[in-house]
Amino acid sequence: MSERYYFDIRSLCDEVSDARMRAERFDELQTLKLRRLKELCGRLPEPSEAFFIETQKSFSAFTFIVYLMRTAGRIRHLYIATYSTNERIINALLRWQSQGMIGSIHLHVSETMQYRMPAVWQRLMQLHQDGVLRLTSAWSHQKVACIDTEIGRFVVEGSGNYGENAMYENYVFLRSESVYRFRAGLDE
């Protein structure tokens, strides 16, 4: 009986050696169960600090953008990778951009959005064509925000989309230049 292998270990080693790898040590890790972000009392992660958050009441990933604008001030650049969003979120981002609270915006969305949410997709395409924001898409289920502010670069990632969410979601909220660059695709 011949043995069958699912992969060749030598080719796997070559593949791993070509992979992008990043390592960073986080000095502080906080675990929090929150009903709302206000419970952080204006606290932001320090450099190389990460908050692991579990929601106890429904709030979306978008809430972090609002929280950062209130505590850190103007957002110079906002990169959002998401599976889903809605008109209300898009309108809020555009309003803040027109008020100068947000500089440039890059939305990276799931390419399935054009089938699942055709009106939202068309609106985003038009905004991209008009030069209001940058739009990219891929077969993706990511939920990440990279937020560049005057006081530092923050990353939020977790299970929540930029729209309606379940009561229980999980997020990692951190301040790190290298993770920001990695998640925003700036160091490729």
Positions of predicted regions on the chain:
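Short, flexible loop segments at the rims of nucleotide/cofactor-binding pockets, characterized by
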Residues: F52-S58, T82-T85, L133-R134
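Primarily the HKD phosphodiesterase
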Residues: A61-H128
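HKD (HxKxxxxD) catalytic microenvironment of the phospholipase D
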Residues: L78, V132-G185
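N-terminal localization/anchoring segments of enzymes in phospholipid and broader phosphate metabolism
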Residues: M1-I75, S98-Q99, D148, R153, ...
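Conserved beta-strand termini and adjacent loop/short-helix elements that scaffold enzyme active sites
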Residues: E54-T55, H108-S110, L135-A138
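Aromatic-residue detector
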Residues: K38-C41, S60, A81, I89, ...
